[in-house]
C-alpha cells in the first residue's frame, strides 16, 4: 500500500507538503497542490487515520478489517462477524466491522476501511454470492467469507451446499421416504443449483429419479414466502398429500409448510416429513415437532477466515466448509 513518503517522492515534494495538501490545501500554491493530488490519485493513496495515535505508545495489536455487505439485514450472517471477533481476540488481534449496503458507493467505503490501516481484510456477505472485488482490497492480505470473487483469485470460505443437501436427502430416503415435494430457494441464487445437485446425487444413489419429482422455485423477495401454502395445497387432494415429505430450501419455507400441513390435519412426521435448511438461529428446535435441517456453518466460516489472516496463509483456493445435517423429530427414523 502506498505511503505518504511514496506520494512525496512521486510528486517531488517534501513530506510536509503532502501533509499540508491533505490537511490544509489552502496553504499550498495551486500548481503544487495539483501535483500532489495527481500523485495521490496515481498511487491510490488513502490517508492513514491510525497516524493520529499518540506517539510513543506501546505497539498496537494487529487488526482485521471486516467489510460486511448487507449482513446487518439478517441474523444468520451475524455469526460470521461474531466468530471473526472472537477468533481475533483469542489470538491477540483486534477487529472492526465496516458495513456496506448494495446501494452504497463501494470505493468510498473501501477507502474508509483502508484509512484505518488494517493488517488484513475479510470481505463477507449476506447469502452466498459472487462479488466484484475492489482492487484496492488486494493491496493487503484478503480473504472472502461466504462469498466468491468474480474476477480475482482470492481465498474464500463458503458453505458446502451440495454436500449439505446431499446428506439431508440421503437421510430422508434412508428413512423410507420416496416422494418428496421439493420447494427450492429462488433459482437465481448461487446456493440453489448447488443444493439441487446434492439432492439429485442422493436420489440417484437411492434409485429415485430426481426428474420425476415435483420441483418448485420460490420467487425472489421475502414477500413470496406467502406463496408457499398455495404451492403445498396444490398437491393435496381431499386432505391426502401427493407427497410423503417436503424438502425445503430454508427453515422459513419449512415454517410455512408446517402451518399449511397442520391446518390440513396432517401429522408431522407420521403423514409427511419436513426437512429444512439453515438451522435458523435459536429457532430450529422450537418447531413442534423439532425441525430436521442442515446447519449453515457461518461461525466456522468466520473462524477459518480469521485464522487465514492471522496465520498468514497464502493459498487462494475456495474452501467448502462442512454443512452438517441435524436429524430431529420432523422425520421418522430409518428402520
Which residue stretches match the model-derived regions?
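An alpha-beta-alpha
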Residues: 168-208, 318-332
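Flexible loop/turn connectors
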Residues: 233-335
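Flexible loop/hinge segments that line or gate small-molecule binding clefts
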Residues: 124-167, 252, 278-291
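Hydrophobic alpha-helical segments within soluble ligand-binding/sensing domains
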Residues: 155-182, 225-234, 296-314
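Periplasmic-binding protein-like
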Residues: 66, 117-125, 181-184, 240-252, ...
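Short beta-strand elements in bilobed, periplasmic/extracellular small-molecule ligand-binding domains
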Residues: 88-99, 200-226
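N-terminal helix-turn-helix/winged-helix DNA-binding helices
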Residues: 1-2, 41-75
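Extreme N-terminal segment that seeds HTH/winged-HTH DNA-binding domains in transcriptional regulators
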Residues: 1-15
